A protein has these predicted regions:
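Amide-forming acyltransferase catalytic core, primarily the GNAT-like/NAT-type
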Residues: 6-10, 25-27, 99, 118-193
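Active-site rim helix/loop that mediates acceptor-substrate recognition in acyltransferases
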Residues: 11, 15-58, 157-179
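Conserved beta-strand in the GNAT
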Residues: 46, 52-60, 67-72, 183-191, ...
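Conserved acetyl-CoA-binding loop-helix of GNAT-fold acetyltransferases
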Residues: 73, 79-92, 96, 115-119, ...
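Conserved active-site alpha-helix within GNAT-family acetyltransferase domains
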Residues: 80, 84, 108-126, 230-248
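Conserved GNAT acetyl-CoA-binding A-motif
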Residues: 94-106, 128, 220-230
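Conserved catalytic-core motifs of GNAT/GCN5-like acyltransferases
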Residues: 103-107, 123-136, 245-256
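Charged, low-complexity intrinsically disordered regulatory/assembly segments
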Residues: 179-257
Length: 257
């Protein structure tokens, strides 16, 4: 059964011991997440009980790759086989479209979901960290916001993206953001009032990573996050040294069809 799952649906699905008891999406942030990551809500796999949606799996497709970006089941209907049925249907759906490679991320605090994904043939490819720092006081020089095309972003990054959400296409679809560049490192940053998010960043070594973080402090005073940075990268090591905190640790999972 398919229908368009909403922000309210996923906010309800994600409540519990792993995700907490607060809404993870607003209507605007949900729409932005869906658009930037090519999530096809019309193709989402859902399950209902009566008139109520009790589970949904929404995915994006880029060529022969798919990303299972949103998977959730109503807490009242867990352990009823809902997630298993949706996963079966979603894998079959993307396979029918020629997809040969599926990606997803799983919180390391969510051991049952890790075992669940492994049961479908997903294997761990890496470890991704969600980093954050508090707002910085003092005078800063704001960076100009601009638009860049996907090809220009790829030319700046010059390396495979850490994950689906940080691919050049996802960054370009953010529409307006700042580009920060230092020798050997770069960052694309989107700001919104008192909060900022690094859409993507990279550094070739420890020195360039440290220089990039100093530049971020000079130009981005807001609370700042960087999602899904590989745990073993020069940037992750520099973030730890600079006092950023780890908000989440995730397993990066892949499945080849």
């Amino acid at each position: 059964v398919s229908r368009h799952p909403s922000a309210a649906d996923f906010n309800r699905f994600f409540r519990g011991a792993v995700f907490g008891d607060y809404d993870i999406f607003s209507a605007d942030s949900y729409a932005d997440f869906v658009r930037r990551n090519d999530i096809e809500l019309a193709a989402a796999v859902t399950r209902t009980a009566g008139r109520k949606t009790i589970g949904a799996l929404a995915f994006g497709v880029r060529g022969r790759r798919a990303w299972f970006g949103l998977i959730g089941v109503d807490p009242k209907h867990r352990r009823e086989g809902v997630a298993r049925a949706m996963m079966d249907d979603a894998i079959a759906a993307v396979h029918a479209r020629g997809v040969t490679h599926i990606e997803l991320e799983i919180s390391q605090r969510n051991a049952p979901t890790l075992a669940f994904a492994q049961g479908f043939g997903f294997e761990q490819r890496g470890e991704l960290m969600v980093w954050a720092r508090r707002a910085r006081a003092g005078k800063v020089t704001a960076l100009p916001m601009r638009r860049l095309r996907e090809q220009a972003i790829a030319a700046i990054a010059q390396a495979p993206a850490a994950c689906w959400q940080r691919e050049p296409r996802s960054v370009a679809l953010a529409m307006r953001f700042a580009h920060l560049d230092v020798p050997g490192a770069y960052a694309f940053v989107r700001t919104d009032d008192g909060f900022a998010n690094v859409l993507d960043a990279g550094a070739t070594d420890a020195a360039s990573a440290a220089a990039l973080l100093r530049a971020l402090d000079m130009h981005v005073p807001q609370d700042l996050t960087l999602n899904n940075e590989p745990a073993d990268s020069p940037l992750s090591r520099a973030l730890g040294d600079a006092g950023w905190r780890v908000v989440e640790r995730q397993y990066q999972m892949v499945h080849t069809l």
